[in-house]
Design a protein with these regions (language model features):
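Noncatalytic scaffold domains of N-terminal-nucleophile
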Residues: 25-42, 46, 54-216, 220-222, ...
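M16/insulysin-pitrilysin zinc metalloprotease superfamily fold
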Residues: 181, 275-291, 447-455, 461-487
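C-terminal motif of bacterial Sec signal peptides marking the signal peptidase cleavage site
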Residues: 20-22
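Active-site rim segments in enzyme catalytic domains, especially the processed small/beta chain
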Residues: 67-92, 239-241, 381-449, 479, ...
Length: 561
């Protein structure tokens, strides 16, 4: 077994360094990385200290998360990048996973048309064709300044020298241990009893990264890594072949662009639903001046929830992979269409999701995702959200390679009208088809104000990604919160179906729930999972950089002065 564990019990006294958690605001800050792990954030900043750009730092940060954040960091999943260069040019990269060539619409249904339990979430059949390494190489070819091998080496070093398990990770490993054993056997790498403060060295992953450092994309999609991946997928019931790996290509796309008051917002286009849904919700609430109501007041919550309800209804019908289905993108963001959508809203009574159908248009995702935000000294900004979908993906572990494989196939509509693991309803537009990209809720977002960079924001959280990003933006813009306060503020969520407002536990007052219930809203609070873990960067009109790292996770910011 390629594992080395050391266990220490040392209390460390924090010292002042460039690695800081939470909100920092200093005129001297030149660059920042905010991610799910301090090791990854620090590696990203170290790359920029050596003269690398935000794009170089992105590659190094991403690969570091593969090592120290194995529940979502990955070389075997996919993601989305939204960027803004220092001269104001914007764009995005789609390196979302794809369905295998052998995939079929009804592959998760039995002979009676019923969904087969766990087939799209656990084991080899749940695995989509990975896009991460191809995406990273595409970014490097277009924007990279430092040599590729220099960007991979820090992750290799981290795998060899080890990362320290946090208390939250200890709980995560323990929670999934039986799934790891069920799929991979008792001797699988992450079935060991890793505990907080252990140092975990993943030698197999270090060797995998060495091949990627030497051969780039070809090192993953061809040769020994590809052979081990295909073998592991197929022996656990999957259908990915070498042809699937060789045919994978990422796609450069135009981001969704919309205005909210004096903000100019760029977010991810389909196959992510994030940009369109975020745009719809913000345009629907704009006429109500939500900032006139107290933060998280009943009225503010009503406005936001009713807009969310209507947008998620549209999501279920219209959104999918634009390479396979025609998406009425412009119509979905038209002000008249959105205004008509909200006409049935009243403060007096909750709308019912059963009465809210997707709007009529004439026209021919896991909570264990991870997000990071980066700004470099030149002013380049990137927002990246990447995922294995569920926590540790399919739970299939490639022992020879040291990494988990995704369960991204669950983000398709296995059966139109039925929910996925996050409770999201999908329609025919998101039905399974060979080499199709599955719909996502990932919402990496970059915002301008007065033609200047204003905010970089995103989060994991499955179906709650869109609403968590939304509330963070509103907290800063409408309620004048600093970025750390905005990131940490209590959140709530509605997604059309199920017709429930989900509140972060123990953060809202009982009398608020009573008032909402009297108006016909169903409330859920007890035993809910955390709603998002936002990582964000804000730039003031004077150019002062501040960071927000979500305290709900182990997230930290690393800064370059």
């Amino acid at each position: 077994m390629n594992a080395i564990i050391t266990r220490t019990y040392i209390i460390l006294i924090p010292v002042l360094s460039i690695l800081l958690s939470g909100c920092t605001e200093e005129k001297s800050i030149k660059a920042a990385v905010v991610s799910a792990r301090k090791e990854a954030s620090k590696i990203g900043v170290e790359i920029m200290k050596k003269g690398g750009s935000a794009f170089d730092a992105m590659i190094a940060t991403d690969l570091a998360l593969t090592v120290c954040y194995p529940n979502a960091g990955n070389i075997s999943g996919g993601g989305f990048l939204v960027y803004r260069t220092a001269d104001g040019k914007t764009g995005s990269l789609d390196y979302r996973e794809k369905a295998p060539i052998a995939a079929s619409r009804d592959m998760y249904l039995d002979k009676n048309g019923n969904i087969l339990p766990d087939k799209s979430t656990l084991g080899g059949l749940a695995i989509g064709v990975p896009g991460t390494v191809a995406g990273l190489e595409a970014i490097h070819k277009k924007f990279g300044t430092l040599p590729w091998k220099d960007l991979v080496q820090p992750a290799i070093n981290l795998a060899l020298n080890g990362y320290v398990v946090t208390e939250k990770q200890e709980l995560s490993f323990a929670e999934k241990k039986q799934d790891f054993i069920k799929i991979n056997g008792e001797n699988t790498f992450y079935a060991q009893n890793f505990r907080a403060n252990d140092t975990v060295k993943n030698l197999a992953l270090a060797n995998t990264l060495k091949l990627i450092a030497k051969h780039g994309k070809a090192g993953f999609y061809e040769g020994a890594i590809a052979n081990d991946l295909v073998e592991r997928v197929q022996e656990t019931g999957g259908i990915i072949t070498h042809q699937d790996l060789l045919s994978y290509e990422p796609v450069w796309r135009d981001p969704i662009n919309f205005q909210y008051k004096d903000l100019n917002i760029y977010s991810m286009a389909p196959p992510s639903s994030g940009g369109i849904c975020l745009g719809q919700i913000m345009k629907m609430i704009e006429p109500f001046n939500v900032g006139d109501y107290k933060h998280n007041s009943m009225e503010a919550i009503q406005i936001i929830v009713e807009a969310e309800r209507r947008s998620y209804a549209d999501r279920s019908l219209y959104l999918g992979d634009p390479d396979f289905v025609k998406i009425p993108q412009n119509e979905l963001l038209q002000e008249k269409y959105l205004s008509d959508h909200m006409k049935s809203f009243t403060f007096e009574r909750a709308s019912k999701s059963t009465d809210i159908l997707p709007g009529t248009i004439s026209w021919e995702e896991s909570e264990e995702t991870t997000h990071y935000s980066i700004i470099d000294p030149m002013g380049n900004a990137i927002a990246v959200t990447t995922t294995l979908n569920g926590s540790y993906g399919s739970k299939v572990f490639v022992e020879k390679g040291g990494y988990f494989l995704n369960n991204e196939m669950d983000d398709f509509s296995s059966k139109p009208g039925f929910p996925n693991m996050f409770g999201l309803i999908g329609g025919k537009a998101n039905a399974i088809s060979p080499q199709k990209r599955m719909l996502s809720a990932m919402t990496p977002t970059i915002i301008e104000k007065n033609n200047k960079l204003y905010m970089i924001v995103g989060t994991p959280g499955g179906s709650t990604i869109i609403t968590s990003v939304l509330q963070t933006i509103l907290n800063v813009y409408e309620y004048d919160m600093d970025i750390q306060t905005a990131v940490a503020a209590p959140r709530f969520h509605h997604q059309w179906l199920p017709d429930i407002i989900t509140f972060e536990p123990n953060k809202f007052k009982r009398n608020l729930f009573d008032s909402l219930q009297k108006k016909g809203y169903d409330i859920k609070e007890e035993y809910n999972r955390i709603i998002g873990r936002v990582d964000a960067i804000k730039v003031s009109d004077k150019g002062i950089i501040s960071t927000g790292a979500d305290p709900r996770g182990d997230d930290e910011a690393s800064l370059l002065y």
